[in-house]
Amino acid sequence: LTCVTGKSIGGISTEECAAGQKICNKKWTKMGPKLYDVSRGCTATCPKADEYGCVKCCNTDRN
């Protein structure tokens, strides 16, 4: 499985997931008005969102 770890004007960066990590995730955390910290990567289970963010998980390549 290959997950996107970052997106920018220059393109996307990806990582190959380790054994046992079969889910790609993207997590948004609100840092301020219209300002979010976004993290992406591989995981074994879909993390839960906290009160200031949201999480999207999938098990397909490069989403």
Curated annotation (Swiss-Prot):
GO terms for cellular component: extracellular region. It comes from the Eukaryota. GO terms for molecular function: toxin activity. Expressed by the venom gland. It is found in: Secreted. Disulfide bonds join C3-C24, C17-C42, C46-C57. Keywords: Disulfide bond, Secreted, Toxin. Its main location: secreted. This protein shows a synergetic toxic effect in that it enhances the toxicity of other D.angusticeps toxins. Heterodimer of C9S3 chain 1 (AC P01408) and chain 2, linked by at least two disulfide bonds. Belongs to the three-finger toxin family. Short-chain subfamily. Aminergic toxin sub-subfamily. This is Synergistic-type venom protein C9S3, chain 2.
